[in-house]
Design a protein with these regions (language model features):
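N-terminal glycine-rich phosphate/adenylate-binding segment common to multiple enzyme folds
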Residues: 1-38
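Short glycine/serine/threonine-rich phosphate/pyrophosphate-binding segments
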Residues: 12-26, 88-89, 137-140, 167-168, ...
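Acidic/polar active-site rim loop that often engages polyanionic ligands
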Residues: 34-48, 73-76
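Glycine-rich phosphate/diphosphate-binding loop of Rossmann-like nucleotide-binding domains
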Residues: 53-108
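Conserved small/polar residues in nucleotide/adenosyl-binding loops
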Residues: 236-238
Length: 238
């Protein structure tokens, strides 16, 4: 499969497992149960960064790339209420203030805001739900297999393509529990990404994010993370 992708025999592939490098992770696509809305889940497998918050910032860009390539010109972004959500929100809003084109969703809860809760997951409030890959993986499993009581995944498009800066192999991930409808969905998802030139969309999106100061924001995040890591190490007694 890897040889066929490398030499251009195939434009994309659907598989259960793939060793994505650090910095590349997958953007899932589900059908939410309350209103039947499609929602991209950024991200579901792989590791965007060793730092959780940096990873969620990158996941947002990966999700925007997938959504735009699939025809959503101005996708809305929501951040799932998990550890690091507020720091991610702050960084993304700084990116937005610097000129990066990002539209935040409003939670269905009365207090609104772009940090999403459980009801927003079920209703598909944002076009893109940003989270860490472990939580995103669970979300896809639950939403895809809800109708079967968890016995197999019957709806949606699987765990999605691996996306990362400079990465140009279209590999779509499904699981052992993915039923025929999900496999078919993953193939349709891949075809859409190929036809609409996902790698060109990715280049443009990364360029826009860099122009808006993505590197500076990520560097500041790394600097902020160092004291916390040092403090944790100081508590370890050998």
């Amino acid at each position: 499969m890897e040889e066929m992708l490398a030499n251009g025999e195939v434009d994309g592939a659907v598989t259960m497992h793939f060793p994505f490098p650090i910095g590349v992770s997958t953007v899932g696509r589900v059908v939410t149960p309350a209103k039947g809305r499609e929602m991209f889940v950024a991200n579901t497998t792989g590791t965007s960064s060793a730092d959780r918050i940096e990873g969620m910032i990158k996941n947002t860009i990966y999700g925007i790339i997938a959504a735009k390539t699939c025809g959503i010109a101005n996708p809305t972004v929501g951040i799932l209420n998990v550890d690091g959500a507020r720091q991610t929100e702050k960084a993304l809003k700084e990116l937005q203030e610097n000129g990066y084109d990002i539209t935040f969703a409003e939670s269905a809860r009365a207090d609104g805001g772009c940090v999403m809760r459980g009801n927003d997951v079920l209703q598909g409030t944002p076009d893109i739900m940003v989270t860490d890959s472990l939580t995103g993986n669970i979300m896809v499993k639950m939403l895809s297999s809800a109708a079967t009581g968890g016995s197999f995944e019957a709806t949606g498009y699987g765990y999605g393509p691996g996306i990362g800066e400079g990465y140009e192999q279209l590999v779509m991930i499904v699981s052992r529990a993915s039923g025929a409808p999900v496999i078919a969905g993953a193939i349709r998802y891949a075809a859409q990404l190929v036809r609409n030139k996902v790698f060109e969309v990715a280049k443009a999106e990364f360029a826009a994010a860099k122009k808006a100061g993505l590197k500076k924001i990520l560097d500041a995040r790394k600097a902020a993370a160092k004291p916390a890591a040092a403090e944790e190490l100081s508590l370890i007694h050998i």
